[in-house]
Amino acid sequence: MSVMFDPDTAIYPFPPKPTPLSIDEKAYYREKIKRLLKERNAVMVAHYYTDPEIQQLAEETGGCISDSLEMARFGAKHPASTLLVAGVRFMGETAKILSPEKTILMPTLQAECSLDLGCPVEEFNAFCDAHPDRTVVVYANTSAAVKARADWVVTSSIAVELIDHLDSLGEKIIWAPDKHLGRYVQKQTGGDILCWQGACIVHDEFKTQALTRLQEEYPDAAILVHPESPQAIVDMADAVGSTSQLIAAAKTLPHQRLIVATDRGIFYKMQQAVPDKELLEAPTAGEGATCRSCAHCPWMAMNGLQSIAEALEQEGSNHEVHVDERLRERALVPLNRMLDFAATLRG
């Protein structure tokens, strides 16, 4: 495949880590956020990969902690007039596309995603134009502009089922942007899939040799893997799935020790689900030159207590998500198709 933009060779500048807060500062911001949420008629919608203290705050204030599909559902149905989306930018955009009448706030609008960055809309449009006979399916981890070009949007929790459905209709697929997830879905369904070559900087760093050594050290452990991981890591898994599916697998598997190959932010909810089980991080070869993300998305880490308080307190463009209305209407079509399809799966 030849594209103008090569995600494999792209180096994304990582944001600086937030300044650590003292115990007193954390307590101050937690109480301030709780008060501001009530004053703004706002609710928190947080992703599993945000830091534990952010997820805990969402729980305590009646918010949502979930994968991107459930975040979209929850935000669209909740009566609050303001959604505080703790995650990365495409999640805030998706919330605005589905709920244009609501105010969508984010702790920072600079929280990117390597999959989103790795799929620039101009190059992606050219790629799609070169293959006009293919149905365009894009992962939720994309910009509003890329979604607007798609026929379908999909999350990892329903990717296999959707592609299996489209394949049964004889459709050939363009899949973007995650090459590992695309390869996994193709292997599961046998579909005719042409993949864009993006990757998640967290999951792409899991190392087979290091995971093998950890498995040898803990032979009684089950391995849970997100399908954004390289094929060699997926092949070692006892369970493969989206964040919500991995939490469900943790409960179902009989093993008392679990090696988890996804962003370590998931440990907060997974440990709640299996309090008596031991959770181990799958290795990325450790902190230092051999890994950049080291099993935690640096942009998810930008969602801090101080920035959440600022988003709720300060009106204006520094925190509010805006999506062009014509673009929003186009992106809404494949998003609604995803939600309708997901609803049929739920029965």
UniProtKB/Swiss-Prot annotation:
Pfam families: NadA
Main location: cytoplasm
GO terms under biological process: 'de novo' NAD biosynthetic process from L-aspartate
Family designation: Belongs to the quinolinate synthase family. Type 1 subfamily.
Keywords recorded for this protein, A-Z: 4Fe-4S, Cytoplasm, Iron, Iron-sulfur, Metal-binding, Pyridine nucleotide biosynthesis, Transferase
Sample GO molecular function, one term: quinolinate synthetase A activity
Catalytically driven reaction(s): iminosuccinate + dihydroxyacetone phosphate = quinolinate + phosphate + 2 H2O + H(+)
Residues reported in the UniProt entry to bind [4Fe-4S] cluster: C113, C200, C297
Gene name as annotated: nadA
Full protein name: Quinolinate synthase
Compartments, record wording: Cytoplasm
Naturally occurring in which organism (per UniProt): Escherichia coli O139:H28 (strain E24377A / ETEC)
Entries under InterPro entries matching the protein: NadA (IPR003473), NadA_sf (IPR036094), Quinolinate_synth_A_type1 (IPR023513)
Positions with a binding annotation for iminosuccinate: H47, S68, Y139, A140, N141, S156, H226, P227, E228, T243
Function description: Catalyzes the condensation of iminoaspartate with dihydroxyacetone phosphate to form quinolinate.
Co-factor remark: Binds 1 [4Fe-4S] cluster per subunit.
EC assignment: 2.5.1.72
Pathway assigned to this chain's UniProt record: Cofactor biosynthesis; NAD(+) biosynthesis; quinolinate from iminoaspartate: step 1/1
Required cofactor(s): [4Fe-4S] cluster
An example Gene Ontology CC term for this record: cytosol
